[in-house]
Amino acid sequence: MSPVCRRLVMTVGDSRVGKSTVIKLLIELFLSQNQTVKIYNHDNRNKFKAYEGIVPVESLNFFTDNPDLVLDDLLNDSLDVIFVDMPGQYIQETCNYIYEADFFTVLAELNWKLTFLQPISHRSDCMEYFLQLLDFATDNANYVIVKNQHFDTRFKEYNQLVQQKLPLIGGTEIRLTALHRDHYQGMEHLSKPYSQCFHEQSLYVLYRSYIYHWLKNFFDAVKNNQVASIYLEAV
């Protein structure tokens, strides 16, 4: 067993709220800190194709394939962080997968910590999924909410249902600032890691500047939040 506590980060919640985007941003942050990362991707749309030459990316249907593939990697001493990008909306199936794999026990025995990372939009479904997950996992995991300002800046449902509860369970929130759709699409069309996009000469200088500051703002949001910096980084 490794004496160092490592981190498994599982993205959960609604569909199309920015889960893969947040993972890509965190990959950039971890790689800048010389941490070794692996991704398990439930989606078959190759969302992480731009990163395949940088970090291991493995496709896995968590509801039909063998979950031991993920469990086996917990024995890999070379890994610092494992991302598991769960499918959106399937929160009950996600809980069932964790229960059937006895995930909480295995992680504790192998000295891994679990973080549930949930980007949210303005939709009430996001909060319903989170509360269901919290009721299931209780204190077996850490919790980070990412307020994706691409959708809204007010987050009324979050403020009413979750915001006051989050610190009581040791959870925290961070903010992902909005990036204009044209800038984001221009970056995505390059099919390159985000950190390479603001050096890309084919993009307008203004686009590159906005992309650079968008990345920097997110990195600062993680680093300046003491709780998030623990829950989202191997320590």
Where are these regions (language model features)?
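Conserved catalytic-core segment of NTP-binding enzymes
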Residues: 92-187
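Walker A (P-loop) phosphate-binding loop of P-loop NTPases
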Residues: 15-16
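P-loop NTPase switch/communication element
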Residues: 45-60
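Switch II (G3) loop of P-loop NTPases
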Residues: 80-98
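Short beta-strand-centered segment that lines the nucleotide-binding/catalytic pocket of NTP-utilizing
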Residues: 34-48
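Hydrophobic anchor at the beta1->P-loop junction of P-loop NTPases
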Residues: 11
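Conserved lysine of the Walker
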Residues: 19
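Hydrophobic positions on the alpha1 helix immediately C-terminal to the Walker A/P-loop
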Residues: 22, 26
